[in-house]
Amino acid sequence: MNIKAYAKINISLDVIGKREDGYHLLKMIMQNIDLYDIVQVEKIPNGIKLKCNKPYVPTDERNLAYKAAKLFKETYDIKSGIYINIEKNIPVSAGLAGGSTDAAAVLKIMNKMFNINVPQSELMDLGLKLGADVPYCICGGTALCEGIGEKVTKLKPFTDKILVVVKPPFGVSTKEVYKAFDLSKVIFHPKTNELISNIEKNNIDFIANNMKNLLENVTLGRYKIISTIKEEINTCGALGSMMSGSGPTVFGFFDDILKAQKCYEKMKEKYVDVFITRTI
């Protein structure tokens, strides 16, 4: 059994507090894009085996999809072994939830495959044990995510918006970015409620001009290339550009497919991981 595991971007990312255990309290708008891994899960006699088409992706317990299979097996007392194959297209350590979306796919497939059929809400609770983005990845679409990511509220779908996505040639540790984040230095927070009402109105201009990610405060300071990519995308005629998640990936919204195509071609001359895609 296989499914597409979609990447996400953040239309906004606000940090509103910090828990005693060190986790940051977030308020963010998440959006799936038409860039995906293909995750296949099959039954085998015993154990967990994972294969991936990209050699730099770990195939042991360091992989979130492996952890998802192990957690599901333990939670629902599954005796069968599991074989996972990941055809990886989403860049890793990119701020696109590549690991989380694969883990979510494994949970969804195993839920059906073994006829456990727990409701989506229970699967999301399980996913939270793996990572803050996993509950959203189980749910997908356009959503407001709050708490540490566990509270997911579906929003009106913001589909078919053209975007160019560029990942610089390095990864960023989400943990390190949050560790360096200083909430006391934040002056302007994202206009989350206004963004939501303009998503409902399908107002791409407002979204592109007002989207905001507070983690840029950390990552842009460390990597000047991210600001450069944002400027390059804007120069190509984007309505607006922003870093996704903890970075380093940057995306720009376009209202013209030809401008987006030209931007894609221009960025492809300098960077390996460049995609032209749509919101779904």
Curated annotation (Swiss-Prot):
Cross-referenced SUPFAM superfamilies: GHMP Kinase, C-terminal domain, Ribosomal protein S5 domain 2-like
Top-level EC class as recorded in UniProt: transferase
Pathway(s) it belongs to: Isoprenoid biosynthesis; isopentenyl diphosphate biosynthesis via DXP pathway; isopentenyl diphosphate from 1-deoxy-D-xylulose 5-phosphate: step 3/6
Keywords on record: ATP-binding, Isoprene biosynthesis, Kinase, Nucleotide-binding, Transferase
UniProt cross-references to Pfam families, sorted A to Z: GHMP_kinases_C, GHMP_kinases_N
GO biological process: isopentenyl diphosphate biosynthetic process, methylerythritol 4-phosphate pathway; terpenoid biosynthetic process
UniProt-annotated catalytic positions: K8, D133
GO MF terms, alphabetically ordered: 4-(cytidine 5'-diphospho)-2-C-methyl-D-erythritol kinase activity; ATP binding
Keyword Oxidoreductase applies: no
Binding sites annotated in the UniProt record for ATP: P91, V92, S93, A94, G95, L96, A97, G98, G99, S100, T101
EC number, UniProt record: 2.7.1.148
Reaction catalysed by this enzyme: 4-CDP-2-C-methyl-D-erythritol + ATP = 4-CDP-2-C-methyl-D-erythritol 2-phosphate + ADP + H(+)
Function as written in the Swiss-Prot or TrEMBL entry: Catalyzes the phosphorylation of the position 2 hydroxy group of 4-diphosphocytidyl-2C-methyl-D-erythritol.
Alphabetical list of NCBIfam families matching this protein: ispE
Record-stated family: Belongs to the GHMP kinase family. IspE subfamily.
Protein name (database record): 4-diphosphocytidyl-2-C-methyl-D-erythritol kinase
